[in-house]
Amino acid sequence: ACGPGTAGLREGTGSDWQPIAVRATPADGAIVASSRSHGDRAKIEELLAGMNIRDHVTAGSSLKFCLLAEGAADVYPRYGPTSEWDTAAGHAVLTGAGGSVRKFDETELEYGKAGWRNPEFIARGAQ
């Protein structure tokens, strides 16, 4: 089964393990996860115009999905090429924590495409 609460666990207090989960974007602004070496900063800024942005964090590979899934970041816009194998595991973890990955037209990012190339997308924690 996949869905909120199925992504994974993190250590809580004592020996308790807590499910990871996305967070509601804080009132003081969103944290944007972005790639260390890919993407177009100007396009990202344009896409996020009108959003209250508090900070940007950089991470490699699927770690950006994990930052959203654990509530350490709020949005991950992706410009530039990726392949399905670059995103599938992170997408599953984020979805399991309550987040989403959508193309810029707001339809769900799909898998099994000819050529296995992904379009540009935006991953989000809470909606």
Feature map (PLM): residue ranges:
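Acidic beta-strand-loop-alpha-helix segment within the catalytic core
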Residues: 1-65, 118-127
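Oxyanion/phosphate-interacting regions
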Residues: 25, 46-50, 65-127
